[in-house]
Amino acid sequence: MRVIYMGTPEFAVAPLHSLIGNQYDVVAVFTQPDRPKGRGKKLQSTPVKELALAHGLMLYQPIKLRESSVVEIIKSLEPDVIVVVAYGQILSKEILEIPTYGCINVHASLLPKYRGAAPIHRAIIDGEKKTGVTTMYMDVGLDTGDMLLKKEVLIGADETAGELRDRLMALGADTLIKTLNQVQRGTLVGEKQNDLESSYAAMLDKGLGQINWNQSAEAIRNLIRGTIPWPMAYTTYLGNRVKIWKSRIEESEVSGKPGEILKVEKSGIFVKTGQGTLVIERIQFSGKKPLDVREYLAGNTIEKGVLLGEEDGN
């Protein structure tokens, strides 16, 4: 089976590795162009590019996949299937119709829930207890094609988006191989999605991580877990931005304003929320490394009564 693989971030590495390991004929890899990153703005390769080069695969990094010259290249490769995993560009109808077996996508949710760019993060932020991966035939819509295989997992109570991503990446790689084997044998029939059950997982931005202390402790803790490792949940302490890496919930209701520091112990910083108390266990001030509260308090102080999220703390 001649495969063209299209993918870009870390999540797309394991499926490509699995294709190579299972001796699929990967005739070309398409990934996003190198982008400037970091303070020095040096061009950085995508994780998929690095794997493709390590295995000597033919590599393409078109700025626009829809350009006629790129479409002609894809046609000339005569793919049996195009596999797409978090590529970052939309495939035109013309491209979708090129492969013999169509274009197959690995999506990190139980479709039709959480269509879109950030299904892993949004599932945790929304407090979902389970998620998974879905393989599907691609059509011109956004994650709207007929579903092929679904694999479900439970989301751990303390699991972060980064940890869940790693689990779903491995599950996606395994599910992709099973999907391709069944598609090639003709034993797999696509199932249409129910649009009435669909939801959309919008792309993340830095502002998403700002904590609203009027929300419940549970909602804030879900935000913290769902934004690790990026964009990170944050608040301010006396005007200084603080990222929060770890927290737990205390159910006891006490008086105070949302965002108010109720008490400070080595085990954590107790903060009043709209419902319940959030205990912050690991923090990171701007320009500093993450520290457990116990470590931070060894050389610093946190004042009781300060309102988090207020520029002056009052």
UniProtKB/Swiss-Prot annotation:
Matches recorded under CDD domains:
FMT_core_Met-tRNA-FMT_N (cd08646), Met_tRNA_FMT_C (cd08704)
Q: Name one GO cellular component term.
A: cytosol
Citing just one GO molecular function, the answer is: methionyl-tRNA formyltransferase activity
Task: Name the SUPFAM superfamilies for this protein.
Answer: FMT C-terminal domain-like, Formyltransferase
Q: Which residues form a coiled coil?
A: none
Look up keyword Protein biosynthesis and say if it applies.
Answer: yes
Do the record's keywords include Transferase? yes
The protein's matches in PROSITE patterns, at most eight in alphabetical order, are given as: GART
Keyword list (alphabetical) reads:
Protein biosynthesis, Transferase
Under the heading NCBIfam families, the entry gives: fmt
Q: What is this protein's function per UniProt? A: Attaches a formyl group to the free amino group of methionyl-tRNA(fMet). The formyl group appears to play a dual role in the initiator identity of N-formylmethionyl-tRNA by promoting its recognition by IF2 and preventing the misappropriation of this tRNA by the elongation apparatus.
Indicate the family of this protein: Belongs to the Fmt family.
What HAMAP family has UniProt attached to this entry?
Formyl_trans
Q: What is this protein called?
A: Methionyl-tRNA formyltransferase
* Originating gene: fmt
